[in-house]
């Protein structure tokens, strides 16, 4: 049968959700301006670097900064010429070419130099300031060496070196090299005892020829006259020296007759003579 009625509306099938894509516009103008500024910045940086390099070359090549004078300060034992020789600074060297730390290290190779500092004074001068070591005592190891106030062993004694310092004996060389704490503590005590003797008027550092160190008995001093042992023990040195000074004027003329002096008895000084013991209150 033929349908002659009005045509049916055809349903349109809708394909899934479609979103209209927005076309992206590239900001060429902005990019071009950014690129231009970047190029200009790089060019400026390049010019700065070039100018700096040129200026650096001019500084190193200029005669204006060549070393003309070297001033040496605070040297007493070591002469100026010896310090200049150690520095190995060639005349006419550009002041900017010098490695000041390396120059200081070369100067410090001398055992008498504790430290050296080098600084520039523009345009053409250097200043070298040194701190020298001062012997406090002589320590007996495999050989005799100078010892400074900080306990640093710094120089083996040679012909012509001064010998008028107290000698510290009883130090184990290997233990000292290894930094043994007990050995370092002993040396420190000996140096502190020398400090207490320094400046005294009755029994002073000039009355002492040697300090013998021992783990068990502590420190024993030996007098310059007669080589009499003075037993000081491990501590309380100041009060012991005070007691000793009260009777030392009486003993000084008889040191050749004394076997030993012991300060380790509380509030007493024991003096052993050949004939027996003389007890002195202090």
From Swiss-Prot:
InterPro entries: Cell_div_FtsQ/DivIB_C, FtsQ, FtsQ_C_sf, POTRA, POTRA_FtsQ_type. The chain crosses the membrane at residues 31-51. Residues 52-282 are periplasmic. It is found in: Cell inner membrane. Residues 65-133 form the POTRA domain. Its main location: membrane. The keyword Mitochondrion does not apply. Gene3D superfamilies: Cell division protein FtsQ/DivIB (3.40.50.11690), membrane protein fhac (3.10.20.310). Essential cell division protein. This is Cell division protein FtsQ. The gene is ftsQ.
